[in-house]
Amino acid sequence: MYIHERDNWTSFRWDTANLTAILEEVNRKQGMLYGRLSSLGFDSKVKAMAENITYDIVYSSEIEGIRLNMDEVRSSVARKLGIENVKCTAPSHYVDSVVAVMLEAVGNYNLQLTKEKLCAWQAAFFPAGFSDGCKIETGQYRTNEEHIVSGMFGRERIHYIAPWPERIESEMNKFIDWFNHDESCSSVIRSAIAHLWFVSIHPFEDGNGRLARILSDIILARGDKSEFRFYNISSQINKDKNHYYNILEKTQHGDGDITEWISWYASTLSLALDEAETTVSTILNKSMFWQKASSIALNQRQTDMLNLFLDGYEAKITSKTWASLAKCSKDTAIRDIQDLIR
């Protein structure tokens, strides 16, 4: 029996006592992260958010087996946020559409969710109306049965069968009403529930996983009361996709007790916050370095190369390496390096 076949299936239950420790850990890390971010200037915050959103978009797509060009996504995000001096890689129309969805969603986290908005976001993921070469329904709830399967043709394994199409409208009305109005538990728990609930309805023919993660981000943004997003769960899920799909399948075959799902979700979020802390530390160190070096006259090549090292480049630098990275002659590279040493 699948979870949606049970009576009152969305009356989810969880053991608060078993979740207290991990939820407190997540709350503490959220507080520490935003505390450190308070010392960053506005421009640095925007750049940090741009990098986080880039990773979120790329890895959320990769979870579904869709590979996006990181430089294209980064360039599109930077342009839409008004960030200058970013390596320009012309993004495709598709990448621009996906980036626009994410920025609209988290930038307007306090606005009401609607069916029309969800349908528009899903359509943006499939501008040509195809997925894996097959024509699909876009911009509307699905009208066909949906089976989640894996394996080779003839040896498929069914992991989950979503609710019948006739139920989707009423199921989604209930979900959207809950999403817009329920504040009975913490934002972390609501974020975990939103993810599970949405993918269990599976309202669209494709794109449900990515939409579920966007909806989770919106609830976290509401909890943080900030459109600035500095951490994302997609990067961590992508590192262990098998665990993600296993815990999701187990919960969708369960009896409505989602304690294990929330625990996994919060633990994954905790790891995401650790990664964000590392990113913010890099940005803070970089900011402090340039404050101290503000009186030193540097050419653009030197500035670019120093930024490269401040961003974590660890290879030993030689005049040959410098010339290659800075796209200059070896003699020019030698002068640049000697000038910095002096």
Predicted regions and their residues:
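FIC/Doc superfamily catalytic core
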Residues: 1-342
